[in-house]
């Protein structure tokens, strides 16, 4: 009997509970909110916002303000210095480091023991549960899980307190039983130098029977390419013939899909998207034929949503899950067992179903171009690129885009820097196809492009090989959960990238 067949029944039981998501979502979410408020009643935050007087969602929304990291930073700083009962009961020892705000280089997101187990590890368990449900012939546990993570460091030298990539915190605290099927060893998985880690992982894992991969697509690709270099093989399935699934998240998979098809040629390879962030684990692709993910509503996270067009208004009103509409872009607001209260995480989603609640990630609240009223979001960009690639045979590795507000001739346009894995034969044709696709996808963009009166045709600047990796490396962000910002409404990032494009880093 295989190890997978022995373990499978444990995971099957969980999938039965997920059926509540379709019929009892509001009830489940109200229960989550009640538990959150009850647990935090005697914290500093709970006392300041009169949690003892809150008995329903309406009172919660009235008494607790919508917050950003800047507004919670003072509380989090106190927690990082060892104070207890601030945003969540007890002392929080772990902090997930993520990209910063306008005022800070980095954000430090608290990860409580409750959040670690009830949210992050629950998400990993359900991910496997749904995969096994959809693939009854899977031999997932009969080999190794290659889990790619970041690194961590001591937090203010407090005993047993860590700060670093969420993935590193998860690996550090993982159930020892998981180590039986996980690779690489912890000492390698947590190396801080990504290039050394990449090489060590490739050397170790290439000699093992790897059946599944977990990580960010961009960084996993670096490991896979290095594995091919070391082994001399032409495809990953020659190295790991039993490889069957890649659990991926962190960035949109669309730009990488074709590259993975070239790397892993097995027709039996599966890809399963997850929506896990420093702030929590929010969604899973439960149906391999549907790109939308199911919102995970019983992980100790209470969800609210702000219509995207209202997100920058001081009087913006959030709606609970049961108040959302299909097809509308929303900014996510969460309250969690990690002590984040009505917290804007910066991501935007669009619901494709409300029975159960399923969604696609449409972008970031600060990752868009709206310099001329065109309201271009990441979802538009990903779809436009996919269409242009499909028509030209090109493969995009990385990209970023930003506005050119006015050039020497008084013209405004969008400027794209694109690193191609496989370049199109004619870059101008590719640019035209991308521009036309964006006009079909986004009516505001189409209106601004009308006769080029407001917005000229977009410009594409090809990036030299490894440009974006070099840019991340120059900022100390190579590896881990760091990613290239896709769109920006200013030129800060694109100008840095272009400066590096003139040399070899």
How should these model regions be labeled?
Residues 36, 55-56, 68, 114-120:
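Accessory carbohydrate-recognition regions in carbohydrate-active enzymes
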Residues 1-52, 59-67, 74-82, 161, ...:
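Active-site glycine/GP-rich loop and adjacent strand/helix microenvironment
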Residues 95-109:
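Conserved adenylation A10 loop of the ANL superfamily
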């Amino acid at each position: 009997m295989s190890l997978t067949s022995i373990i499978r029944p444990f995971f099957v039981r969980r999938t039965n509970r997920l059926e509540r998501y379709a019929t009892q979502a509001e009830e489940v979410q109200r229960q989550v909110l009640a538990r959150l408020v009850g647990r935090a009643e005697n914290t500093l935050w709970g006392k300041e916002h009169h949690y003892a007087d809150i008995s329903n969602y309406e009172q919660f929304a009235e008494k607790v303000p919508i917050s950003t990291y800047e507004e919670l930073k003072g509380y989090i700083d106190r927690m990082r210095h060892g104070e207890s009962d601030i945003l969540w009961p007890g002392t929080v020892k772990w902090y997930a480091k993520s990209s910063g705000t306008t005022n800070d280089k980095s954000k430090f997101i608290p990860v409580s023991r409750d959040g670690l187990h009830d949210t992050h590890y629950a998400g990993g368990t359900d991910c496997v549960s749904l995969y096994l449900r959809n693939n009854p012939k899977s031999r997932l546990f009969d080999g190794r899980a290659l889990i790619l993570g970041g690194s961590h460091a001591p937090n203010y030298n407090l005993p047993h307190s860590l700060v670093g990539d969420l993935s590193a915190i998860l690996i550090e605290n993982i159930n020892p039983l998981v180590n039986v099927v996980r690779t690489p060893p912890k000492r390698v998985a947590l190396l801080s130098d990504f290039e050394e880690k990449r090489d060590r992982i490739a050397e170790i894992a290439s000699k093992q029977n790897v059946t599944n991969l977990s990580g960010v697509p961009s960084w996993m690709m670096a490991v896979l390419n290095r594995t091919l270099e070391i082994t001399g093989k032409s495809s990953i399935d020659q190295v790991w013939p039993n490889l069957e699934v890649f659990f991926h998240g962190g960035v949109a998979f669309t730009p990488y899909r074709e590259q993975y098809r070239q790397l892993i040629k097995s027709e039996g390879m599966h890809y399963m998207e997850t929506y896990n962030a420093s702030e929590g684990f929010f969604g899973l692709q439960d149906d391999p034929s549907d790109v939308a993910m199911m919102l995970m509503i019983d992980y100790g996270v209470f969800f609210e949503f702000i219509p995207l067009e209202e997100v920058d208004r001081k009087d913006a009103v959030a709606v609970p899950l049961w108040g959302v509409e299909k097809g509308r872009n929303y900014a996510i607001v969460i309250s969690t067992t990690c002590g984040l209260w009505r917290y804007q995480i910066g991501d935007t989603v669009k619901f494709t179903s409300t029975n159960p609640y399923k969604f696609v990630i449409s972008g970031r609240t600060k990752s868009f171009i709206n310099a001329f009223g065109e309201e271009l979001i990441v979802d538009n960009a990903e779809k436009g690129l996919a269409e242009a690639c499909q028509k030209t045979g090109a493969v995009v590795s990385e990209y970023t885009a930003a506005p050119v507000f006015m050039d020497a001739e008084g013209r405004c346009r969008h400027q794209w820097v694109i690193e191609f894995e496989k370049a199109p034969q004619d870059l101008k044709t590719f640019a035209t196809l991308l521009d036309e696709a964006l006009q079909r996808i986004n009516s505001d963009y189409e209106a601004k492009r009308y006769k080029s009166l407001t917005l000229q045709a977009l410009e594409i600047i090809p990036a030299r090989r490894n440009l974006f990796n070099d840019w991340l490396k120059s900022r100390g962000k190579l590896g881990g959960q760091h990613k290239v910002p896709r769109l920006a409404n200013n030129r800060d990032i694109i100008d840095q990238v272009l400066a590096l494009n003139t040399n070899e880093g």
